[in-house]
UniProtKB/Swiss-Prot annotation:
EC number, as in UniProt: 1.14.-.-
CDD domains in the record: RHO_alpha_C, Rieske_RO_Alpha_N
UniProt entry keywords in alphabetical sequence: 2Fe-2S, Iron, Iron-sulfur, Metal-binding, Monooxygenase, Oxidoreductase
Annotated protein name in UniProt: Putrescine 2-hydroxylase
The protein's role, per its UniProt record: Rieske-type iron sulfur protein that can catalyze in vitro the 2-hydroxylation of putrescine, forming 2-hydroxyputrescine. May be involved in the biosynthesis of the cyclic hydroxamate siderophore alcaligin.
Organism expressing this protein natively: Ralstonia nicotianae (strain ATCC BAA-1114 / GMI1000)
Chain positions recorded as [2Fe-2S] cluster binding sites: C81, H83, C100, H103
Amino acid sequence: MSNLSTALNLVPSETQLPVSAYFDEALYQTEIERLFKHGPSYVGHELMVPEVGDYHTLAAEAEGRVLVRNPNGVELLSNVCRHRQAIMLNGRGNAQNIVCPLHRWTYDLKGELLGAPHFERQPCVHLSRSLLQNWNGLLFEGKRDVRNDLARLGVARDLDFSGYMLDHVEVHDCDYNWKTFIEVYLEDYHVVPFHPGLGQFVSCDDLTWEFGEWYSVQTVGIHAGLRKPGTATYQKWHDAVLRFNNGEMPKYGAVWLTYYPNVMVEWYPNVLVVSTLHPMGPGKTRNVVEFYYPEEIVLFEREFVEAERAAYMETCIEDDEIAERMDAGRLALLRRGTSEVGPYQSPMEDGMQHFHEWYRRVMDY
């Protein structure tokens, strides 16, 4: 295991955030401007639209924009008609053109207006589009240089989506601050006491950390050869992994990359997950979770997919309880007019400490 306190010479008492940081509206607005609008801004994966004509609306934006694959590649277009500002496409599918259902205004797959019925002179308008960066198929529209940020990432090859397909997307709303989500995600101290299923699937005794200026990575091993499932849900997941791999142990139990402030890319046996946080207020966070599997599994192994999804969501609900308890306690302290912070457990909470240090640096806080 690595020790971040030694590696970065951080002083724990100076990096923890006061309880007010999780509820302050003015600070929240500053976070949106400094961290999110100037961050990497992940919008989706190219596997969402594998074929020409494929489209996939952005769930996090109430379908206000859409990923479209045209003959030139993948583009991010506005999904709002230039006539009466109606949402045009819903969900995912394939189309030759983008047609507004209200008045049949029609755009090509590059967003150019092709036709506006009953207009003597066609309006000179088009759908707005955004420039995209591509890293391992992940698409970003932000101002950061994503390739530079992740250039030294040691697990990049493990996060290779070649041969994978998008299976489904979960939208999960959380009743707590986005920073609390990241804190829970970046500490392994709670895995054994609070996650009976996950705690018997992965081994935090094998925890290793990797840190970059804008990211951290946790890698954990497989627990006891998957011989002792902790819950009935995880029993099915253990069985699915062992069956698909013919009894051979996977390389890892899990790999969890956090690209600050809000993008998480996760490796599990024969699974890749992209999870993105979208703050909706100091006490509300939307998590959009994309599940990718090898093509063979998506097409022929539904039991594997359902077992993994159920295990993932079981742990997700448990994490919700942790985060809700943390923010409830912080709110109680805030109302009492005080603030308290505790020490970091190293190495299991090194990631949380790294996040706090990053936050203070970028926010100048």
